[in-house]
Design a protein with these regions (language model features):
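Conserved structural motif at the start of ABC-family nucleotide-binding domains
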Residues: 7, 22-24
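The feature captures the beta-strand-to-loop junction immediately N-terminal to the Walker
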Residues: 38-40
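Helix-to-loop junction immediately C-terminal to a conserved catalytic motif
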Residues: 53
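Conserved ABC transporter NBD signature motif
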Residues: 61-72, 78-80
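Q-loop/switch helix immediately C-terminal to the Walker
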Residues: 89-90, 95-111
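Conserved ABC nucleotide-binding domain
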Residues: 117-133
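H-loop/switch region of ABC-family ATPase nucleotide-binding domains
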Residues: 190-192
């Protein structure tokens, strides 16, 4: 059965003054898949995610979400969709503790999240710690937990796998895959390397200097990779 498109990009251009950040002729994302967006520093990964999240306005071109352009307010500001979640560790309020961030996002299930994602994985030591005192890896753990606990149609995570060890990445990967399987969430993950992405993303899009250099099929759900 053919998957429905959730994003459709045509002739996208993004510029910051005289600097070209993105120039993509055509790119489509389909509902319910996990996508990896890979590229070096300055390739346009973060800018692309922000445009797809409604955080950033393109200079030219068309970006459709479920067949429609993002709505804009009186001053041209994009009205964000409630069913799109964009996560960047730098967006988290560093003056709050981990507990306060979780409670702010999930007031009714704070203790459940503590037990499920922190106590179980020996991360309880960071629970009362302000974000500006935890490691980069712990910040990325927290942002991913926020993402998988929210029932979003689309989840976009910037810098996936950054500053975390392979064991922790496997744990987070399983949580993302579970969410994708159960809820059908479309997931877009950006990374400077395709090492982790190739192991579970359905499609990997490679960016180079703001252009799509190649698109490759990734992991197949029904493959024989089931050994434990």
């Amino acid at each position: 059965m053919e998957l429905k498109q959730i994003y459709d990009i045509q002739n996208l251009k993004l510029r910051f003054k005289d600097k070209k950040a993105l120039e993509i002729k055509t790119l489509k994302f389909h509902n319910g898949l996990i996508y990896g967006i890979c590229g070096n520093f300055g390739s346009g990964k973060t800018s692309l995610l922000k445009i797809l999240a409604g955080e950033l306005k393109e200079t030219n071109g068309s970006v459709l979400y479920q067949g429609n352009k993002f709505k804009r307010g009186f001053f041209g500001k994009i009205k964000k969709h409630n069913d799109i979640q964009y996560l960047d560790a730098n967006l988290l309020n560093s003056s709050l503790t981990v507990e306060q961030v979780v409670k702010k996002n999930f007031p009714k299930k704070t203790q459940q999240i503590k037990s499920r994602h922190f106590t179980t994985f020996q991360m309880e030591s960071v629970w009362k710690t302000p974000l500006n005192l935890i490691s980069d890896g712990e910040r990325h753990w927290l942002k991913t937990i926020i993402g998988v606990e929210k029932d979003q149609r689309v989840l976009l995570i910037d810098d996936y796998g950054l500053s975390i060890d392979p064991r922790t990445e496997i744990i987070l990967r399983k949580k993302i895959i579970k969410m994708n399987n159960i809820l059908g969430t479309t997931v877009l993950l950006s990374s400077g390397s395709d090492y982790f992405l190739k192991q579970f993303a359905s499609v990997i899009i490679y960016l180079d200097n703001g252009h799509v250099s190649k698109v490759r099929k990734g992991f197949k759900k029904n493959s024989n990779n089931r050994k434990k």
